[in-house]
Design a protein with these regions (language model features):
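Canonical P-loop GTPase G-domain recognition
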Residues: 193, 199-256
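Generic beta-sheet signal
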Residues: 85, 171, 196-197, 235
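Alpha-helical scaffold elements adjacent to nucleotide-binding pockets in ATP/GTP-utilizing enzyme cores
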Residues: 98, 135, 160, 164, ...
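Generic C-terminal helix-cap and adjacent flexible tail
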Residues: 322-330
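Nucleotide-state-sensitive switch-loop elements of NTP-binding domains
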Residues: 2-13, 17-62, 68-157, 164-171, ...
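Long, well-ordered amphipathic alpha-helical subdomains in the mid-to-C-terminal portions
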Residues: 19-21, 234, 245-323
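Flexible active-site lid/hinge loop adjacent to a nucleotide/diphosphate
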Residues: 176-205
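Expand to "…catalyze enediolate/carbanion chemistry for C-C bond making/breaking, isomerization
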Residues: 2, 6, 13, 42, ...
Length: 330
């Protein structure tokens, strides 16, 4: 087994094999790995925090993997070291990591200045979020100065990612009629920059029109006194056009946050939110593994299914039993 000093030294020196092993360690849900993982993160924390953290989401069919491949390759060409992480709670259903996106990022996958990590399988959105947050610490300590966090799954994954990044990029497509069609409710409110992808060939003009219309809608949504109104740009990941402007707007947004003290405040609040998220996740883990709860739960679930007991009363009885359990928690 690799000791703490070897992990810390390997990560700080950017040794890919040890960086990968370190991320596997912090992703692990095994009890025997938890103590070492937290010691490692504590040692790496002072060496993290300097990267530009960008969340990326997109409507179905937007070409997100192609965009990240082109965007990340542009950044490594500019001298940056890029890490790509994914938040995909749906991957736990199949019991394996999402590898498809990594194989579609053909340039980044072989770029020595890039590190692409598929989504961990942690069983819950909270588990995946924890693993991704801790992976950010590892990647930053390894010298990656740009971290791209991709949302792959459904549900609340966009909100989870927005809670761990500095700026949030939404990728969308030119559409006939309502330009908001296909964009999940609530995601627009999270976006700091919007990019209309596939602005190439016969779709270039359509994309530019869509960008103008969406920009107007966002101005109405945010109001004239907003601290930041998300710019809407058009780009083509396939032709690598417009990507430099997307980067410029994202870095401008981050610089504005930094200059007003909001970046520090945002990251501090993210850490506090993370703390309480971990409290909820750990309480649920302890509750589910409590022997008394494991004995009682099937009985109560059966009664709830039969309509003999309300969900509220069942929950109260589970919590009562959990609170009465003697001895140390598992």
């Amino acid at each position: 087994m690799i000791d703490l000093d070897t992990y810390v030294r390997g990560v700080r020196e950017g040794k890919r094999a040890l960086v990968a092993r370190a991320i596997t360690l912090v992703e692990s849900t095994r009890p025997q790995h938890r103590a070492l993982a937290q010691e490692l993160l504590t040692a790496l924390l002072p060496h993290s925090g300097n990267a530009v953290r960008i969340g990326i989401s997109g409507v179905p069919g937007v070409g997100k993997s192609t965009f990240i491949d082109a965007f990340g390759s542009m950044l490594t060409g500019l001298g940056h070291r890029v890490a790509v992480l994914a938040v995909d709670p749906s991957s736990s259903r199949t019991g394996g990591s999402i590898l498809g996106d990594k194989t579609r990022m053909e340039r980044l996958a072989v770029d020595p200045a890039a590190f692409v990590r598929p989504s961990p399988t942690a069983g819950t959105l909270g588990g995946v979020t924890k693993a991704t947050r801790e992976s950010i610490v590892v990647m930053e300590a390894a010298g990656h100065d740009v971290v791209l966090v991709e949302t792959v799954g459904v549900g609340q994954s966009e909100t989870a990612v927005a809670g761990m990044v500095d700026s949030f990029l939404l990728l969308t497509l030119a559409r006939t009629g309502d330009q908001l069609q296909g964009i999940k409710k609530g995601v627009l409110e999270l976006a700091d920059v919007v990019a209309v992808n596939k602005a190439d060939g016969p779709h270039e003009r359509e994309a530019r029109v869509a960008a103008r219309e969406l920009a107007g809608a966002l101005r109405l949504m945010h109001g004239a006194d907003a601290f930041w109104t998300p710019p809407v740009l058009s780009c083509s990941a396939r032709e690598s056009t417009g990507l430099d402007e997307v980067w410029e707007r994202l870095t401008h947004h981050r610089a504005l946050l930094d200059g007003t003290g909001q970046l520090t405040a945002r990251r501090q609040e993210q850490q506090v939110d993370w703390t309480w998220s971990m409290v909820r996740e750990e309480l649920l883990r302890r509750l589910r593994t409590d022997p008394a709860v494991k004995d009682l739960a099937p009985v109560l679930e059966k009664r709830v299914r039969a309509g003999e007991l309300t969900a509220t009363l069942a929950a109260e009885r589970i919590l009562d039993v959990f609170g009465e359990s003697p001895g140390p928690r598992p």
